[in-house]
Structures are given as C-alpha cells and as structure tokens.
Amino acid sequence: MAAESIDAELRLGLPGSGGGDGVAAKKRRSASSTVKSEASGTACCGGAGARDVEDGASPASKVQVVGWPPVGSYRRSTFQSSSSSTAAAAKGKGGGETDQGRKNKGGGLYVKVSMDGAPYLRKVDLRMYGGYRELRDALDALFGCFSADASASAAHFAVAYEDKDGDLMLAGDVPWDMFISSCKKLRIMRGSEAR
C-alpha cells in the first residue's frame, strides 16, 4: 500500500526528477561533463568517429529569437530593405542629396503629438518634413487647428515641443536641424498658455 502511494504522489518539479529515486539522478550527466567529453572527442554516441560534420564546415546558422509579438522582425526587415533601396538610389543618382533622399535618410524620428482638448495622440515622423511650414501643414491635416476656415481660432494655438532636457519651448525658435535633433514631444497648446 505504501509503494502504491509513492507512485501516485504528485510532486512539484520536472518529470523524472524525483527526490527519492537515486537511479534517475545517476543516469543524467551534468552540462560540464558533457562539454568536457565533447571537447575531448568522446561523445556519448561513439566518440570522434561518430561526427558527421567536417572540421572545416561552419556550424548550422542559429535561428534568431524574436520577442512577442513578432512585429520586431517584420519592422527590422522592412527597414533594412528600404534603407538598402535608398542607398542604391542615392548611388545611382550621383550621390546628390535630393528632397526625397533627405526624407528617407536614416530611420524615422517619430515623436508624439498632443493637442489641448483632443482626446487622442498622434505620432509624426519629423524627418518627413523639410521645415516648420511643412510640419505645421501636416499638423493642420491631423488636428484641423490651423486651417484657413477657422482663421479666428488659428491664432489661439501654438506649437511647442519638449526637448531632451524636458523643457517646453516654442517651435520655430531654433533652426530646423537643431529642432529635429532635440525634439522629444510636440504639443499644440492654446495661445493663452503659450505666453
């Protein structure tokens, strides 16, 4: 009766790793002994002669582990293909930097854009725009706050940005390249708050 209760006992742990059974523990080898035996050429299946791989052959390529969700590999392959096609196009055109080449150079510089009173945020790629005028037109298309129809309310909004230090500054006060390198967040705020 006691022997039957031991067989049906539930344990926490991996199957076959019972504490009372010394036979199963003796059959397993530690990782260090496995590495030592493979290095010396005495593998468990017949020694050095059992190896099918030639000494000069490279080992099998490792499969790259991707986190969950597997969006990272898709984005990485998309970025690599677009950057290689951009580089090939730049070499084909003589290396001169065109407007399209400037827009596609490097990765995207996405920043969050929030507007006072809007219950949603958007992200924009600052490298897509050549200056403040293009950025303002894009923000108008997203939020509709600077449109000509609402010319009276257009003066009530100002574009501010948060820089690397966390300071809130008005967009347009610094040159465009400096703005791109230091901008971390965009905020469309009411003109009364901007002053």
From Swiss-Prot:
**Sorted UniProt keywords:** Auxin signaling pathway, Nucleus, Repressor, Transcription, Transcription regulation
Which InterPro entries does the record associate with it?
AUX/IAA_dom, AUX_IAA, PB1-like
Q: Which residues cross the membrane?
A: none
Q: Please tell me whether the keyword Transmembrane is annotated for this protein.
A: no
Asked if the keyword Transcription belongs to this entry, the reply reads yes
- Cellular compartments annotated: Nucleus
Give me the ranges of the annotated region Disordered: 1-61, 85-107
Tissue-wise, where is it found?
Answer: Highly expressed in flowers. Expressed in etiolated seedlings.
A GO CC term?
nucleus
Induction, as annotated: By auxin.
Where does the record place the PB1 domain? Answer: 108-191
State the source organism's domain of life: Eukaryota
Biological processes annotated in GO:
auxin-activated signaling pathway; regulation of DNA-templated transcription; response to auxin
* One Pfam family linked to the record: AUX_IAA
Q: Which regions form coiled coils?
A: none
Q: Where is this motif: EAR-like (transcriptional repression)?
A: 10-14
Question: What does the subunit comment say?
Answer: Homodimers and heterodimers.
Family classification: Belongs to the Aux/IAA family.
Q: What does this protein do?
A: Aux/IAA proteins are short-lived transcriptional factors that function as repressors of early auxin response genes at low auxin concentrations.
Q: What's the protein called, per UniProt?
A: Auxin-responsive protein IAA14
What organism does the UniProt record list as the source?
Answer: Oryza sativa subsp. japonica
Q: Which gene encodes it?
A: IAA14
